[in-house]
Each structure stands twice: as C-alpha cells, then as structure tokens.
Amino acid sequence: KQPSEEIEKIVKVCKENGIEPTGSVFLKPAEEIEKIVKVCKENGIEPTGSVFLKPAEEIEKIVKVCKENGIELTGRIFLKSAKQLQENINYISENYGDKYLKPLIITKNIKTLQTVIQYLEEKGVLEILPQSASILSLTIDEIKEREKFIEGIGENISNKNGTKFNSIFGLSRRKYAQRVEKEKNKEVEL
C-alpha cells in the first residue's frame, strides 16, 4: 500500500506524461514510473497497462529481445519476462522458423507451445498459426475435443481457404459449451 504523498507523486508523474493514473500504475513508486515512461518513450511504446507490471530495467531487456528478433512490441509482450520470451523465441525459431515469432505465439507458456505446435504440425495445419494464434489459448485436450466436435458436425479444422482455424477454436469455454448443447438439441429434434 502506497503512502498518500507517494500517491500524490504518482498522480503528478502520470499527469505530466499523459497517463491515466489507474490500476497497475499504483504498483510502482513514482520514481520507477518515471523510468518506465522514459524507456517507453525511447522505444515508441505507449506507457499503459502491462508495462507497469515490470521494472524499467526488465522492460529494457524485453524491448532488446523483441527488437533483436523483429517482434512487435505489444502490451501482451510485457506479461512475460525477457528470459521467458527469449526461451520461447529460441524454441520456436529453432524448431519451426521465424515466421511463427508473433506476440500472440511467443507469450504463451513453453509447455503449451511444445505440445500444441507439435500437434498442429502433425495435423498439417501449422501454417495457419501466425494468422490464427488464438487457438493457443486452449489446452491440447481442449483442441482435440473441439476438433472431434468440429468433425462431428461435418466441418473442417480450418476455414475453406485454409487461412484460419475454424471459429469453434476461438469460442470461450462458455460459448463452446453452449454450441455443443445447441448441436445436441438439434440431434434430439431429428
């Protein structure tokens, strides 16, 4: 918990830099916020949200890792440490190539990457991943379950052009459960 004078300093630093003083900003002292803002400005990053979850020196390391590997600096990137990002980048680059080095891919858990990417490769649909990375938010078991469901309703794992994964993979767990229920009800009506 920040003392009131520190909160006043934080609000002042935020106002001076056009940052809304809310949420994760208050996790850092004003001095650290100034350092973070400086790193962000030097690298063309908007100082909002997840950048305030890490110290300025970690943000510098993350920026360095991303720039060295040609990765866009999005908010999601700052949810991982530079070390984790580098491990993921190395794994993906060495095993699958640089075209898979996208923020939505490299920020996933390494175990997820190892199992899911390998599975997608075995299925012959890995090429779709850079354009349709939301499938990585599912576990391997959820992917297999949804794949079985998709086949059961006569659809394919990818869209007709083979450019994106079937939209079923992008559904939230709740929406997916509703879709399954809807299909069961259709079967009952028949």
Predicted regions and their residues:
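Long amphipathic alpha-helical repeat/alpha-solenoid cores
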Residues: 1-190
